[in-house]
Amino acid sequence: MTNRRQLLTGLATAALSMSILQRAAAQHFVEAKDFGLDAADTGDQSSKFQMAVDAAAALQQPLSLAAGTYQVSNITIGRPVTIRGAQGATLRMGPGDAILALSDCGDVVVDGLTFDGSDALGRDGTLLSITNAQRVTVQNCNFLRAAGTGIRAHNMQGRIENCALSDIADTAIHANDSGGIEILGNTIARCGNGGIRVWRSQSGPDGSRLWGNRISDIDWVAGGNGQNGNGINVFRADNVSISDNHIVNCAFSAIRLNATKNTRVTGNHCQDSGEVSIFSEFGFSGSIISDNLIDGAAAGISMTNFNDGGRLSVCQGNIVRNLLERSPNNPDTVPYGIGVEADAAVTGNVIEGVPGTGIVIGWGPYLRDVLVNDNMVRQCTIGISVSVAPGAGHALISDNVVSGSGEHAIVAAQWDEIVSQDLPADADQFSNVAVAGNSII
């Protein structure tokens, strides 16, 4: 490990005066300007900034960056260091793959910097890259105009907090194979394909926590049928908590869970989603979706894909309202409030204003052990529909209030064909369904 004497000797040979180095060692912080960084210099200052970072790490003192814009790229951090920027301190991306790259390190703090990728347009770059890093804190930073990703983290443990990320060509924050990352209180806007992604290379424990983020205007430039266009996307990552986020105007889902286990989605505000607002799909198990407010979407909440192993969920205390007649982005999506298929409880939800079905229970034979009770379903074309197709499993529909249905209140269906328009009256014809105590107004 480099000690102070080695650092001073090495940097002195790089034409830095000993007085500058001695002053840096004597202060409680290292000033980047002492290493030649100058906001008036419009050229590349990467080598100067790298020396300042290395000096701060070796001296175990914070690095202070004054206000101004500095063009740098591929700055590497491999040991503990704190970098703090004054208001207006901006790192503009030069030629390279990233502005800062943390790798194989721990105890790193990046605080108060602006990362600007405007000069990297046309290159698929990352503003901040974090790989195999523990106890990392990124806070109070701005990330602007990335040609690729704002923050790309692989095997990171730590926090990304109170940052603003906007005009990102791909995804604002992409965390892969995390070790308990916390993404808290960030503001994310105008991203090409995703807001926050928490993914894993293989299914397994992740433990990330996403809380209090504001996400808006997420497009799906790369296309597809759900892998892009989501505010929050969790893929193969287990034990993730998503709560109290405000998510508006996503091309596909506000929150999309794919092949996850034991995920909690609670207390989120989801508005104007172009497809299913909250989607738990493809081999998931153990999803809790509760106390969310959905206003405007092509469909509300989906806990489906039993054919691919999707099962075991609770959907409770949500409000779903004001759905669209069709999806602007996925022609296969039909409007429904809540869709559920296997090993699930749907209870205490309020659904209003669906130009389709309020609650859809099962699809063809893909239905098993579903409880639907104590819900309020208002002003939907059809209130509740349950599958009675050959092979469909059991469902209990009880104590719901279905009010103001445009066509039918509670129906039985085989795939998309209604075989009973009045299921409470015809319930004895279908052995897989129990219907009791519902109020139809």
PLM features per residue range, with description:
Residues 54-58, 143, 247:
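Residue-level signal for alpha-helix termini/capping positions
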Residues 50-58, 70-84, 91-136, 148-156, ...:
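Extracellular beta-strand-rich solenoid/capping regions of secreted or surface-exposed proteins
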Residues 101-111, 128-139, 156-159, 179-182, ...:
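Surface-exposed loop/turn motifs in large extracellular/passenger domains
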Residues 72-75, 87-88, 93-98, 118-126, ...:
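Short glycine/acidic-rich loop motifs that flank beta-strands on beta-rich extracellular proteins
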Residues 1-15:
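N-terminal secretory signal peptides and thylakoid transit peptides that target proteins
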Residues 1, 21-34:
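C-terminal segment of N-terminal export signals and the immediately downstream linker at the start
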Residues 32-66, 71:
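Acidic Gly/Asp/Thr-rich repetitive segments characteristic of extracellular carbohydrate-active
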